[in-house]
């Protein structure tokens, strides 16, 4: 409970069981097929409770509790082909199931009986296609495209000062790429990139509304170089870049809604070094090597002056370990 007696959300008791079967087989030496099934049993007991009020003076809404029972079968299937090391394609399909943020839904209820509240679970259909490549054991590449659709969404939105679950249909799609190379026996380098986008179906039936920055992060690029000058030592330099996400306009008051603030670009360098001497391990890590000043993505997307906070500056950590 809060200090003045209001409950943040009702006290929930959940009992979950999920038997599953997962199989994998190889056909004709090169074709890999996997298949799985899962059955979820979820029983949530909800006591009688009061809806969370924005102010103590707001009228009290009493909700009669009860039990919420969920039963669901979900499947997954995947196929990959690895006869040619330089090009190994794969496709996959899976179903997801969750009772996402049930507490938020219940605490913001507008009905006085549990059975009248929309507590339907989130079910997703997930698709992925991609390929992996191994070129002479010195260069590994991978790339994939994914798409997820849900008839009932799980994005969050602000309503009367509280976060509530947006049940509008949603779709999320994106790409993931990675590359790793052994340039010399003691020198490696690599990079990875990820980009996501998510949209909601508006009342007009069009996919013209972006999901909030809480659910969809900005694009991210990571790069590294790892060098071992002598045996049992290493030096690694990392570069991390997060992109800009600016999908929303200020509201009528000229400010951004929470979760819709502009997320600006961030560039960081991190340095790590280590050496092993017999049973001793010594490592040095310097995060934010250039002491770059920036706000955390959480501060930027929330767009509330009171919660803007700088991220950590340069941070040096020395670790000593002994094995026996």
Question: Could you describe each region identified by the protein language model?
Answer:
Residues 29, 142-150, 166-252, 290, ...:
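Gram-negative outer-membrane beta-barrel transporters
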Residues 19-25, 77-81, 129-133, 175-181, ...:
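Residues on the lipid-exposed face of transmembrane beta-strands in outer-membrane beta-barrel proteins
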Residues 189, 232, 241-250, 274-324:
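C-terminal beta-signal and adjacent terminal beta-strands/loops
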Residues 82-100, 118-173, 178-182, 194, ...:
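Membrane-embedded beta-barrel scaffold of Gram-negative outer-membrane proteins
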Residues 3-10, 22, 56-66, 111-118, ...:
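Extracellular loop and loop/strand-boundary signature of outer-membrane beta-barrel proteins
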Residues 33-37, 75, 89-91, 140-143, ...:
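Transmembrane beta-strands of outer-membrane beta-barrel proteins
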Residues 1-2, 45-54, 101-110, 153-161, ...:
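Outer-membrane beta-barrel translocator domains and adjoining extracellular loop/strand segments
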Residues 1-84, 205-208:
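Signature of Gram-negative outer-membrane beta-barrel scaffolds
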